[in-house]
């Protein structure tokens, strides 16, 4: 019995150890790189000068950590082939509108993505970080300043003008 009591006491004491402290270092918001490669994209009759995201690293970073998006700025994400896509608002500090485009540049779906508040210090712990799905095959995604899709009256099926051939050839 003394052995059992000793084991219970040991288990109780060892389970009370504090977890090591965790240092949370928030990401520092950044401004767009003025030297980033851009391309002109026309949405709803309005020209935008969008940064390119052609490879996995660029697509993963996307517009994360930005404090602002220029009125005519944003990013175009190009993929090698049409596929089901899903984007999240990871480390995003401003609202972003997303347009998913098929291989011909037609709008498949759009979303007004809102800033996600951290839960427990981490945005990814917030269930609202779940993906915004393309709901169909898409080869491109375009992200612009929040509110512009509605302001421009963009709808599913609309054509977005972008250098399709170049983007398809360069997507990795």
PLM region spans:
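C-terminal motif of bacterial Sec signal peptides marking the signal peptidase cleavage site
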Residues: 12-15
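Compact, glycine-rich, soluble single-domain proteins
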Residues: 17-172
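Bacterial N-terminal signal peptides that target proteins for export
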Residues: 1-3
